[in-house]
């Protein structure tokens, strides 16, 4: 999800030269900062999320009203059993006493100020030395808690299966405090496990392995088929050191099973008998009702040529050569009449040979897009796997309604939880393809069809990226049928606050990758997708909520894969994600997390929200009319009060600084001249709230983007922020201008599907559950989907007064000619990017040595960006030669609504000409870009990005 580290793009620039530092104060109405997930003022204690993954679609067992009486101790788990020998608790026992109580049958109660109903009562003594350094490192948020020693002869392995309470008593014996315990630390200490998990197949046997150290009893209920009411066998598993196992005949393969687990669950204070899928499931029945026993190595599940697919994958010489196109599986084909109806909206649509969508993808691949990023394709909640259960919209009715009607959204929202659409950020099981995208959600069909999709995309020239959501779970607790991990080992897989309730900052049911077996599950899951499905990259949703250690370990494990040993080349697998730093993990509160600033130097990419916000203006949660570099700030005002013309001029200059840092791959140490005339590093350019703009150590750690599935589409946000009176031609040029800046930036460019064809969602800012109607992509290029009704009320109603007149105005809607020109222009910029390695420099040193910005400093034109990249010459000292064709590239961006003429005297010796691709472009406007070699004088048409090159002369 594409949100910001800061709540707005930066409006101030700082430098280490304090005497020369430039400070810029925003008008107060632009300074309002909000928590980006709750949209509440920062400092608010509310955790009610208003985010695209609406918590209406998720369930959590974390809620409890605050109470303070010792009588209510069971509602809380405020103590931490951090290791075999230590319990941490922030209670001063003093001269009193402290005891640990355990009940195998969850019968603890407080009667007459005394804990009763226990099977074990253990006296604890405080360790005055406090918590060890290792404990403080693993649990930094409780580093100041007191340490209580656990007797060395205690049978801890059996004790953790019980209901546990720690109690403190006054010297007179009166109960002072009592609470439950969080036991992830001691589970890691005693039960960390490296052996097999899930179903393991051999020639003669199938063995089940389940990690469940707190379970009292585990049985596997085996079913012949996905819907039979009675199991054909119930198998009791045996436990060894927290791992439960059972072995059966090979005939189990192809059957279904669920686990029946008896386990204490703190959320209900009871021993619960729960029914759950295998956390390591590799197959499922429809809607994940049962785990399917499938051997992914079976030849029957391999498309023809599957084992040789690594040899067919498109070449990847460097991660710097990557460009990413983000696409939802259903969006691609649900409304494409050229796709066989049985394939529409599913995996097999990508295997169609000549559909409109496939023809479109072929053009993008030929132009340079290397990686296709698919929104979640694991088993998620919110969409039934069986299509006959879906409710479908009446498109004929919807098409009859006016473009600004609220009728369309009313019709869609009435069925939105029962249709076939959801983005999929509601994870149930991470390691199984989503059943609703398969022809048959039962059996092995989803596995085979997913593999066919990957194979087809590789053969089209794309490497495949999966969107993985390891930061939260759709459900928790013992009763929700979509709850899995929290049923098996209650309270372990989820991150809990100091009261013991589940953290919800991501939306709900935050996971805890700081726990050993959570990290292991994540890495094992990645290995499954990489090895068994031959996936080429992973995009981590809310990566900042995952520990840096987990991400680095995952990268190292994946990189170690080889074609000879594993059938894949792990060094070609690229990892990137959302490095936002917020919630309970902010500022390393739970350990070093994988935030933007923390992952630099790892080679893991993170989304650059700085360039996005500077280009568009404001932030996704600011006022929708706040303008930015490409949406008319200062140059085409829309009437919004930014604080006056001088303020707008400064804002535009600072936004330009941020864009230039982003175009230099957002490198911390890249040196440029800022709008105040000072030479500063990228890390010394700051947002208005003091956050460094740059964070990367090498170019592949920056993923530059201006739009993604979150928030409005690029065309929509441009249509919202630009003045109502400008023409649709200008809006289309701005759409192209914005994508060209991303394409010509160093680092990795990322594009949202449809950016290239002016895609609209009728100004829906959060279409995660808005159905096919608002999410349509038309690869026939007849419509961009603008003006199909007011967007859904839930997330957009406050903007309806702004949206309604725009949708009603027919002049806002692009015609087919606009869409076709936009596509041609997008193809042009991709081809230009891949025409020279100078636009894809591989190291920070190369960028620092070769890339320069002109038209900088206080007297510069803030509406013009001029970037040059210089190459060396073979056999001459200085820079090495990278490009055999061009020795110099100049990119000029003009966001002004008029021609821009200027001179750069230092370029007079350069024999520059417009790039051949632009000289032959279908864009007649860009052909008007000129350069006078004798004077160094340029003339650039309005709202355009011109690329000039100096060709090498043969000697």
Predicted regions located by residue number:
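The feature marks proteins involved in alpha-glucan
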Residues: 39-83, 98, 103-207, 229, ...
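Conserved, mostly hydrophobic/aromatic
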Residues: 210, 259, 327, 374, ...
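Substrate-binding/active-site clefts of carbohydrate-active enzymes
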Residues: 330-335, 339-351, 362-370, 375-533, ...
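Loop/helix patches that line or flank the sugar-binding groove of alpha-linked glycan CAZymes
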Residues: 686-890, 895-912
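Short proline/glycine-enriched turn/loop motifs at strand-loop junctions of beta-rich domains
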Residues: 90-97, 211-218, 252, 896-898, ...
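C-terminal beta-strand-rich structural cap/linker in extracellular carbohydrate-active enzymes
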Residues: 253-257, 929-955
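Active-site-proximal helices and loops of the catalytic beta/alpha 8
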Residues: 387, 391, 542-689, 693-695, ...
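N-terminal chloroplast transit peptides
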Residues: 1-39
């Amino acid at each position: 999800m594409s949100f910001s580290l800061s709540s707005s793009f930066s409006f101030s620039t700082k430098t280490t030269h304090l005497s020369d530092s430039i400070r810029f104060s925003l008008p107060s109405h632009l300074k309002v900062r909000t928590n980006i997930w709750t949209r509440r003022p920062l400092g608010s204690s509310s955790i009610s999320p208003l985010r695209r993954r609406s918590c209406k679609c998720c369930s959590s067992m974390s809620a409890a009203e605050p109470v303070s009486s010792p009588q209510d101790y069971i509602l809380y788990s405020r103590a931490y059993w951090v290791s075999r020998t230590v319990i941490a608790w922030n209670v001063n026992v003093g001269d009193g006493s402290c005891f640990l109580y355990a009940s195998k049958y969850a019968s603890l109660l407080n009667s007459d100020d005394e804990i009763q109903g226990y099977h074990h009562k253990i006296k604890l003594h405080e360790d005055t030395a406090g918590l060890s350094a290792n404990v403080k490192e693993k649990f930094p948020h409780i580093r100041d808690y007191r340490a209580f020693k656990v007797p060395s002869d205690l049978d801890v392995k059996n004790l953790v299966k019980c209901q546990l309470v720690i109690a403190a008593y006054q010297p007179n014996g009166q109960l002072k405090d009592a609470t439950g315990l969080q036991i992830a630390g001691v589970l890691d200490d005693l039960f960390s496990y490296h052996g097999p998990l899930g179903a393991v197949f051999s020639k003669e046997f199938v063995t089940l392995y389940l990690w469940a150290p707190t379970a009292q009893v585990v049985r596997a209920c085996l079913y012949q088929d996905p819907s039979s009411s009675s199991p054909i066998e119930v198998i009791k598993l045996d436990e060894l050191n927290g791992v439960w196992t059972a072995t059966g005949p090979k005939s189990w393969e192809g059957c279904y099973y669920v686990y029946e687990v008896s386990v204490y669950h703190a959320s209900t204070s009871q021993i619960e008998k729960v029914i759950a899928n295998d956390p390591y499931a590799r197959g499922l029945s429809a809607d994940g009702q049962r785990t399917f026993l499938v051997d992914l190595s079976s030849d029957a599940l391999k498309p023809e040529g599957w084992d040789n697919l690594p040899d067919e994958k498109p070449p990847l010489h460097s991660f710097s050569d990557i460009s990413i196109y983000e696409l939802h599986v259903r969006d691609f084909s649900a409304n494409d009449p050229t796709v066989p109806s049985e394939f529409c909206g599913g995996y097999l649509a990508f295997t169609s040979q000549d559909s409109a969508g496939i023809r479109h993808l072929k053009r993008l691949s030929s132009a340079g897009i290397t990686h296709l990023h698919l929104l979640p394709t694991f088993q998620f909640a919110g969409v039934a796997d069986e299509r006959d259960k879906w409710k479908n919209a009446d498109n004929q009715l919807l098409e009859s309604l006016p473009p600004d009607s609220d009728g369309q959204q009313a019709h869609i929202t009435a069925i939105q939880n029962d249709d076939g659409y959801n983005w999929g950020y509601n994870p149930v099981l991470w390691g199984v393809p989503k059943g609703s995208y398969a022809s048959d959600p039962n059996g092995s069909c989803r596995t085979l069809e997913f593999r066919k999709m990957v194979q087809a995309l590789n053969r089209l020239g794309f490497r495949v990226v999966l969107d993985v959501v390891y930061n939260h779970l759709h459900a928790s607790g013992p009763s929700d049928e979509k709850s899995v991990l929290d049923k098996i080992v209650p309270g372990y897989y989820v991150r809990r606050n100091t009261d013991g309730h589940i953290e919800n900052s991501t939306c709900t049911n935050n996971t805890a990758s700081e726990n050993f077996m959570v990290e292991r599950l994540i890495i094992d899951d990645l290995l499954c997708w990489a090895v068994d499905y031959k996936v080429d990259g992973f995009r981590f949703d809310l990566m900042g909520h995952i520990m840096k250690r987990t991400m680095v370990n995952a990268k190292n494990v994946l990189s170690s894969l080889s074609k000879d040993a594993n059938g894949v080349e792990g060094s070609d697998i690229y990892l990137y994600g959302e490095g936002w730093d917020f919630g309970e993990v902010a500022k390393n509160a739970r350990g070093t997390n994988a935030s933007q600033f923390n992952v630099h130097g790892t080679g893991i990419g993170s989304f650059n929200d700085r360039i996005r916000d500077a280009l568009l203006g404001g932030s996704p949660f600011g006022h929708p009319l706040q303008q930015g570099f490409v949406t008319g700030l200062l140059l085409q005002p829309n009437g919004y009060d930014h604080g006056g013309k001088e303020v707008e001029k400064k804002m535009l200059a600072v936004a330009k600084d941020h864009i230039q840092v982003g175009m230099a791959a957002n490198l911390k140490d890249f040196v440029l001249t800022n709008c105040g005339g000072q030479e500063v590093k990228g890390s010394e350019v700051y947002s208005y709230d003091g956050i460094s703009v740059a964070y990367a150590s090498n170019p592949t750690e920056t993923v530059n983007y201006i739009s993604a599935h979150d928030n409005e589409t690029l065309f929509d946000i441009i249509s919202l922020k630009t003045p109502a009176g400008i023409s649709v031609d200008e809006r289309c040029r701005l759409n192209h201008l914005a994508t060209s800046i991303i394409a010509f930036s160093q680092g990795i460019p990322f594009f949202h599907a449809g950016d290239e064809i002016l895609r609209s969602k009728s100004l829906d800012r959060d279409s995660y559950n808005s159905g096919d109607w608002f999410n349509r992509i038309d690869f026939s290029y007849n419509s961009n989907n603008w003006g199909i009704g007011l967007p859904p009320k839930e997330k957009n109603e406050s903007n309806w007064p702004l949206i309604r007149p725009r949708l009603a105005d027919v002049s806002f809607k692009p015609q087919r000619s606009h869409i076709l020109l936009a596509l041609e222009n997008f193809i042009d910029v991709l081809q230009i990017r891949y025409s020279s390695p100078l636009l894809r420099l591989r190291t920070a040193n190369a960028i620092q040595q070769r890339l320069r910005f002109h038209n900088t400093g206080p007297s510069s034109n803030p509406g013009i960006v001029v970037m040059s990249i210089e190459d060396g010459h073979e056999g001459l000292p200085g820079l090495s030669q990278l490009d055999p064709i061009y020795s110099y590239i100049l990119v000029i961006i003009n966001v002004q609504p008029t021609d821009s003429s200027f001179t750069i005297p230092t370029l007079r010796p350069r024999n520059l000409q417009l790039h051949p691709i632009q000289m032959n472009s279908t864009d007649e406007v860009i052909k008007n870009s000129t350069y006078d070699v004798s004077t160094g004088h340029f003339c650039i048409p309005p709202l355009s990005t011109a690329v000039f090159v100096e060709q090498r002369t043969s000697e």
